[in-house]
Amino acid sequence: MTVRVRIAPSPTGNLHIGTARTAVFNWLFAHHHQGQFILRVEDTDRERSRAEYTENIKSGLAWLGLTWDEGPFFQTQRLDLYRQGIQTLLDKGFAYRCYCTPEELEQMREAQKAQNQAPRYDNRHRHLTEEQRQGLEAQGRKPVIRFIIDDDREIVWHDLIRGKMTWKGSDLGGDMVIARIADNPDQPFGQPLYNLAVVVDDMDMKITHVIRGEDHIANTAKQILLYEALGATVPEFAHTPLILNQEGRKLSKRDGVTSIDDFRKMGFLPQALANYMTLLGWTPPDSTQEIFTLTEAAQQFSLERVNKAGAKFDWDKLDWINSQYVHKMSGEELVDLLVPYWQEAGYPINIDSDRPWLEKMATLIGPSLTRLSDAAKESVLLFGGRVDYSEEAIAQMKQDGVKDVLQAVVEKIQESSQLTEDEAKDTIKQVTKTFKVKKGLVMRSLRAGLMGELHGPDLIQSWLLLHEKGWDKTRLTHGLSLVE
């Protein structure tokens, strides 16, 4: 048997972290078993579905490295297939036309509420005679299609994460609507609904394993009944834990960042985010291993090691994983990723003419980055001919003998248009010897004059970057003018 799984997002919003984590687990499972990963777009909600959300979902999955083997398939292009399934259920007596009005259904719910009963359809139109149906239609009523759910039925399945699952038919809310009222009088019924469309799709696409969030467990019970009624083999099911916020509630838009776009803009690398999502509910055989590619994770992945309990989203853990990936990247690899953040900060750069210089910048600040978005903050002292001086930097430059030291450095800079690392170190050595001061004083004073702060990235490498732009002389001269 070839393993076939699917991710089936609805394009009613941008790609959500929960959907993306489900996609990761499906992708890992498929690749572990040399199977196929299928993308299906469940776009039957025509009012809320948008083409731009579909593109966002596709680009988000691709950005994370979750390439699909088949698709994308769109449910709006498969309506005839669903109608065939509905007609089959009608012909076999597993479904019927229900003519209840919205007002009657509301009255039903209110009566149940008054008796402290859970709201459910009472199946009143399940056994209408042909004469009764004709009478209701003569009143101008249009039917929905309902699937019969036996209240006495016990639905049992073995969940690959949760073990034996049991659901009572009486807990499923009565006979289930599987098609809306027809918009077109030429059609026997209207828009097919979620549970019916999902089952028909999974049958047609020969899905062997349905891996999705635990919030779908009730749907699974309903869908098993539909598979059986349509004469199909029921796939295996696995219900993954929800992603929780730090308070233990389901992660939602109220928590702020939830879409993959949000994480991308915040400066997380796709491989780091995919790595983190892999661990968000799954424990590898070697529980000490935390850094791996999707391919490496797929080799070890099994549903048996997916947790049942909700997985708390840990920002510190994600930051740490992201930093591990960032710190392994060269300046050449980083530079194009950092440019947008420098540009957003308004730093004066030209990506074409400044590329070699920017690569050196990326090399310098790379080890201090946690997120790519930290680039603006970490390099703020390295852009421009002027810099704001902290009180500590001013105090450092006012120390006895420091002005002479810095002036000597300015003169050395003027003697040569080029500055190598060895020359920079030699200049510090010569000034230290000439003025008979400690090297530490020279280094602190030079940092204060060049950077405006007493702490920051490597001093020599920072100086070399500033010198390429001619900003070292400008800054030192300005700094000296402040302490005269």
UniProtKB/Swiss-Prot annotation:
Record protein name field: Glutamate--tRNA ligase
Catalyses which reaction(s): tRNA(Glu) + L-glutamate + ATP = L-glutamyl-tRNA(Glu) + AMP + diphosphate
UniProt subcellular location: Cytoplasm
EC number, as in UniProt: 6.1.1.17
Pfam families xrefs: Anticodon_2, tRNA-synt_1c
The family this protein is said to belong to: Belongs to the class-I aminoacyl-tRNA synthetase family. Glutamate--tRNA ligase type 1 subfamily.
Molecular function as annotated in GO: ATP binding; glutamate-tRNA ligase activity; tRNA binding; zinc ion binding
Motif ('HIGH' region): 9-19
Origin species: Crocosphaera subtropica (strain ATCC 51142 / BH68) (Cyanothece sp. (strain ATCC 51142))
Nucleotide-binding is among the record's keywords: yes
Binding sites annotated in the UniProt record for ATP: K253
